[in-house]
Amino acid sequence: MLSRVRGCFLAGACGDALGYVVEFSDDSMIRSKYGKDGITQMDLIGGVAEVSDDTQMDIYTAQGIIHAAEKNCDYEGMVKEIYHSYLRWYSGHVQCVHSSGTCC
């Protein structure tokens, strides 16, 4: 089961990294930059694929759920643990908000 969960996170992160560079682009903009086939490989920065806040939030949500499970929390407790995970994410990204409201 754990390997399936890891696989889901990895596949989601790979898809996010592949599409992150064109997240707010329309089809014509993508084709003009990448050709008729669109994106066929990840843009790497220093050999690393960059993911968006979407993947980061997935990870922090899972972290909150794991913390809640470790503490045998009820639903309300789980929500609080996820909330605290989001605060940890936010505290590392306060300086990083674009004018569009998205994080880098």
Give the predicted meaning of each segment:
Residues 1-104:
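Structured, active/binding-site neighborhoods that engage oxygen-rich ligands
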